[in-house]
């Protein structure tokens, strides 16, 4: 566990050398690789290799986090809320003491971060103490033909042939402590280094994952599952599908746009396809029916226990009532968030301007302005304008007109209902469509009224509408929060003899299992590993498809079969393998260890047949997809010619 890190707060990683090398997924490092890429130096397409420490590339927004200890603080947190009369009062009291406990950690030691997380729907609370390192540099990235082989087509699919890995290095000050980026920093020397195994695995071999899974909803009620399906999941499917089609068309046409939009397209499409698979799996695996059966058993238990009946008699009627009360508006809010908050980047810029603190210290203002201006590096105004028009149309067709924000009235009255004309005018008259205009806004002595800018003005209208919609369901949401907490607690008490693991919440978790294939449907069986043979098969099958395009020199290297010590027992090269470990988003980059604590590979995906895994674990069907560490080392040494990195590893 001392070698396992949270990578950027959104992925996982593992330390593999005495000089702070970290293995994580290619898609976890994708944004960093993209930021350093240009048409002239296309590290996304061609890969990147640092031949020396001096060539390693800094990433100002990136950090790694080491867990030092955990502590149960449930009594202290709940004691602060014992006099709360409403759910909102309870939340305020709980949040307040959680923040205080976290701050106490950093006050005692400024190099530490304390975070209190809720477990079991807010029935328990635990403090995690971390040490963060903010100087993390890119060392090695394979070309996307390795790290993203299969792209969207193969995403969430098995069999898989993706070398989804990248290599970074942690830097520290001369005392080996955390420090912001400085050319004077030196490679970090970790407390523990994960050894690497070249022995591989067999069917049934022990395998465990260690990482930082983001979130699951394993104990959510059936009412909550229905809301998830028909609300946020369906909104994501509909809206992102429209937005991504526009992005993809232009990315395929222009290399500069492909680089600019690569990271945001990758992030967007990942959860878009996840939502599609989740909704299908919920139906196919009868998740709702199973959850309702569990709820029926709980109803019987409540009826059979008078002391429980007194407390929980209205539990299910309250959940049903309040989920019903917010159903329509919650669905509209889901579309609102996808179409506007996560839609056109002009709106996102305007929202950040509205939140800009002009009274902050000069250093903070300059830093914030720099970050805002950097957003234009990955923005194409013509594409964003097309996206905005598409988002306006999509939202209008998906929700009742009473949920339309004020700008639709303007479109009707001033533009005769012509959305495209409105958008053309908006982008032509707003000053924040360019860095130059934004600079003018953010100068301290500006006399320009920000609200007079049409993009900022409409964003203010959006905030007002969003707040209004949220407020109208606040009471129902409070009752649901309380109901889900009581439901979670009741299920655990009904099965008091069982151990219930808590839902994922971005804290470190271990999952143990075995390497094993599975049967996706009747009459079919999938093996537990893939080899480079499948790369050639997919390249041939998908000839002309950019998702499966591979450089001739890589194909030549693979066809030479010069696998050396990285070959399996048959002399072939394993690429990926699967296990029945339990993972979710955030586990990407998680170390996959054998029983001796040696690294077998990195987890990077789940399988399509069990996409409802955030709601229910299906042991016979659910699989963790990992990239074999031997393939990683082969690519580093043979393709990247980076033998210097191989020498840093503890290979067994």
Task: Please give the residue ranges for each predicted region.
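Terminal presequence/propeptide segments associated with secretion/organelle targeting
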Residues: 1-652
């Amino acid at each position: 566990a001392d070698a396992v890190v949270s990578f950027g707060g959104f992925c996982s990683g593992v330390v593999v050398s005495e000089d702070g090398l970290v293995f994580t997924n290619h898609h976890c490092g994708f944004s960093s690789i993209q930021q350093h890429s240009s048409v002239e130096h296309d590290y996304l397409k061609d890969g990147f290799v640092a031949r020396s420490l001096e060539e390693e590339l800094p990433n100002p927004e990136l950090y790694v986090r080491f867990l030092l200890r955990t502590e149960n603080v449930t009594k202290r947190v709940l004691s602060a809320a014992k006099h709360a009369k409403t759910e909102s009062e309870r939340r305020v009291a709980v949040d307040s003491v959680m923040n205080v406990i976290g701050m106490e950690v950093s006050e005692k030691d400024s190099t530490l971060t304390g975070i209190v997380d809720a477990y079991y729907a807010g029935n328990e609370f635990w403090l995690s103490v971390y040490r963060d390192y903010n100087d993390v540099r890119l060392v090695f990235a394979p070309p996307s033909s390795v790290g993203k082989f299969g792209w969207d087509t193969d995403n969430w699919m098995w069999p898989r042939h993706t070398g989804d890995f990248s290599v970074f290095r942690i830097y520290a000050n001369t005392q080996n402590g955390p420090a912001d980026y400085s050319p004077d920093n030196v490679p970090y020397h970790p407390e523990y280094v994960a050894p690497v195994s070249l022995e591989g695995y067999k069917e049934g071999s022990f395998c465990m994952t260690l990482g930082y899974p983001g979130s699951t909803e394993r104990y959510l009620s059936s009412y909550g599952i229905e809301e998830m399906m028909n609300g946020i999941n369906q909104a994501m499917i509909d809206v992102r599908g429209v937005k991504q089609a526009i992005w993809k068309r232009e990315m395929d046409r222009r290399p500069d746009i492909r680089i600019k939009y690569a990271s945001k397209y990758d992030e967007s499409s990942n959860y878009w396809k996840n939502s599609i698979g989740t909704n299908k799996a919920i139906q196919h695996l009868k998740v709702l029916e199973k959850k309702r059966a569990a709820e029926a058993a709980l109803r019987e238990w409540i009826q059979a226990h008078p002391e429980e009946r007194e407390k929980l008699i209205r539990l299910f009627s309250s959940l049903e009532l309040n989920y019903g009360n917010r159903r329509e508006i919650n669905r509209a809010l889901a579309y609102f968030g996808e179409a506007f908050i996560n839609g056109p980047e002009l709106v996102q810029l305007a929202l950040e301007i509205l939140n800009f603190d002009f009274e902050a210290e000069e250093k903070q203002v300059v830093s914030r302005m720099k970050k805002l201006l950097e957003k234009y590096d990955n923005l194409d105004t013509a594409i964003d304008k097309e996206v905005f028009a598409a988002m306006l149309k999509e939202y209008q067709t998906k929700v009742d007109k009473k949920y339309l924000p004020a700008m639709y009235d303007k479109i009707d009255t001033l533009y005769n209902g012509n959305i495209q004309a409105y958008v053309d005018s908006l982008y032509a008259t707003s000053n924040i469509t360019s860095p130059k205009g934004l600079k003018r806004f953010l100068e301290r002595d500006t006399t320009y009224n920000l609200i007079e800018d049409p993009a900022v003005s409409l964003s203010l209208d959006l905030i007002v509408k969003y707040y209004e919609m949220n407020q109208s369901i606040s009471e129902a949401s409070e009752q649901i929060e309380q109901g889900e907490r009581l439901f979670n607690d009741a299920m655990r008490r009904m099965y008091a003899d069982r151990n219930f693991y808590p839902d994922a919440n971005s804290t470190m978790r271990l999952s143990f299992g075995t390497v094993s294939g599975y049967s996706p449907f009747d009459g079919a069986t999938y093996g537990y590993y893939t080899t480079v043979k499948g790369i050639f098969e997919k390249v041939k099958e998908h000839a002309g498809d950019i998702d499966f395009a591979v450089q001739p020199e890589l194909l030549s290297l693979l066809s030479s079969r010069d696998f050396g010590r990285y070959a399996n027992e048959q002399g072939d090269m394993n690429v990926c393998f699967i296990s029945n470990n339990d993972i979710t988003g955030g586990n990407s980059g998680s170390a996959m260890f054998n029983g001796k604590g040696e690294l077998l590979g990195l987890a990077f995906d789940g399988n399509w047949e069990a996409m409802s895994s955030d709601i229910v674990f299906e042991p016979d069907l659910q699989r963790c997809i990992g990239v074999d560490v031997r393939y990683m080392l082969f690519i580093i040494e043979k393709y990247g010619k980076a033998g210097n990195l191989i020498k840093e590893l503890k290979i067994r």
